[in-house]
């Protein structure tokens, strides 16, 4: 059966916009470009205090998305927890991530869940519900092998990774390898932008750092810049327009992107499409599916001295920088929307 109508389901955190929001925006646009009547379904999601989690999941379960105003909906695409709780006879999931605080982030500094009795009970309940709701899906896909590995490890569910290109894929281009390092990430604890900031204390004075992004940890990162002694060489650009970001990528030396256990890491592919090497960390998760140490970037310890050492190599050898950047570009150009759309629509 041909798929003519699709709803893409997303959670919304008001005033916050990141990779998941861009993914949904792109998916809707790509489906419409192929003649598929597509719309998005959004509900706010609040995960704090913890007793808000299950009611917000229940809100999605109350939704019957099989039709709208008498018009049949052929397919729904769920993305993040708890969008896959929605009801539809032809539901597929392209999973960005589950509620990570109860899974791989549990008992780490990035989660408010630990081994307390109430935490364990709620965690077990969320995991059981996830397994039940995801089992309803006619197709189970993820945005990366990293996310697929988590699904298999924690829920025993097999899935297929579907990689997608960044929003600005057609605009990103190389200009020159300038004397500034770029960081593009929300300023949140798990993004570890402070590693890039603290690395500046170990780099020569002709190199600068431009930090793109905003978030709840901005003050923390700014204090790290002050403590580094290199704050005069660090610019906090905040959230910037697409055109401004394209321009920053064009003439950067490289991208430093060292999050903790990232789901995907669109900034990696953005940098590659601008022929910029990427420096990431050995525990950065999804970025390691793209960054090949010594081939298109460097994989280092999550330590400012190690980050600085990788940047220094690129600064000292611009021919190496160009070679790594070209290899990254070639890899990024193999990732297209056609594969994603074909797989999702195969469940008509």
Report each predicted region and the residues it spans:
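Nucleotide-activated donor-binding/catalytic signature segment of Leloir-type glycosyltransferases, i.e.
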Residues: 222-240
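Aromatic "clamp/platform" in nucleotide-sugar-dependent glycosyltransferases that forms part
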Residues: 260
């Amino acid at each position: 059966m041909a798929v003519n109508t699709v709803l893409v389901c997303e959670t919304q955190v008001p005033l916050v916009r990141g990779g998941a929001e861009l993914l949904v925006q792109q998916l809707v646009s790509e489906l419409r470009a192929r003649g598929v009547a597509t719309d998005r379904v959004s509900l706010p999601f609040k995960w704090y205090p913890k007793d808000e989690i299950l009611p917000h999941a229940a809100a999605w379960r109350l939704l019957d998305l099989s039709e709208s105003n008498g018009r049949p909906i052929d397919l729904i695409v769920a993305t993040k927890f708890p969008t896959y709780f929605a009801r539809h006879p032809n539901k597929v999931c392209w999973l960005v991530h589950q509620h990570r605080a109860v899974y791989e982030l549990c008992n780490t500094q990035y989660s408010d869940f630990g081994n307390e009795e109430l935490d364990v009970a709620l965690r077990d309940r969320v995991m059981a519900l996830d397994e039940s709701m995801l089992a309803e899906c006619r197709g189970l896909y993820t945005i990366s092998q990293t996310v697929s590995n988590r699904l298999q490890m924690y829920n025993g569910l097999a899935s297929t990774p579907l990689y997608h290109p960044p929003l600005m894929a057609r605009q990103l281009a190389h200009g020159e390898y300038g004397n500034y390092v770029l960081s593009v990430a929300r300023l949140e604890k798990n993004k570890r932008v402070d590693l890039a900031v603290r690395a500046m204390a170990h780099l020569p004075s002709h190199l600068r750092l431009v930090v793109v992004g905003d978030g709840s940890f901005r003050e923390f990162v700014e204090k790290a810049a002050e403590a580094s002694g290199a704050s005069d060489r660090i610019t906090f650009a905040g959230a910037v327009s697409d055109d401004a970001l394209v321009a920053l990528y064009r003439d950067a030396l490289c991208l430093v992107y060292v999050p903790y256990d990232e789901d995907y890491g669109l900034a990696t592919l953005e940098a590659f499409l601008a022929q910029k090497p990427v420096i990431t960390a050995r525990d950065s998760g999804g970025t390691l599916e793209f960054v090949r140490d010594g081939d298109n970037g460097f994989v280092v310890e999550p330590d400012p001295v190690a980050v600085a050492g990788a940047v220094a190599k690129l600064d000292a050898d611009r021919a190496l920088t160009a070679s790594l950047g070209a290899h990254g570009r070639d890899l990024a150009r193999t990732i297209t929307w056609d594969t994603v759309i074909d797989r999702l629509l195969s469940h008509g």
